[in-house]
């Protein structure tokens, strides 16, 4: 049963919603995307005074808790200008999108409290197409439990193919978690890819399973 809250905050125009939509494309219905504009629209409350902003905080916190109660990953997409408001979420993963320093909204610029680096887990200061996949695996780290029964899959994965996928499907029937262990092999005709190339390929192909699957690089066992 998953109970994970992810807060993605930053100025208007920083790319929060774009990031969230891409994560949803990857992780599917494991995730509930809680977008601040949609929540305001649902409440029909466009008051951006301090009182109005705090009402919005409470709505967003409640939506995140509802998603958790359903066993979903709560993906909170919110400017979240106040430090004290961010703390209310008690997020398992906090991502700061610092791609925009000042937005087009002067009232938001005045109240936005720029965070200290100790107040977030992950910073995106320039958009990269790999960001959604990277964030999926960051989420996965918060889901993974070392004490949970786990199957280990050991192999070269040069490259990942349908047979590997079929084996993974069988492994997931045996235990709630699977650790895919990539053997570090000497380069050659049978091993055309480095372990880091194999790892990158697996991270892209299996990002939808992050937290159910983990990827480890191990010696030539």
Each PLM stretch: what is its role?
Residues 17:
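Walker A/P-loop
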Residues 51-102:
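Glycine-rich phosphate-binding loop used to anchor ATP phosphates in small-molecule kinases
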Residues 20-63:
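Conserved substrate/cofactor phosphate-moiety recognition/catalytic segment
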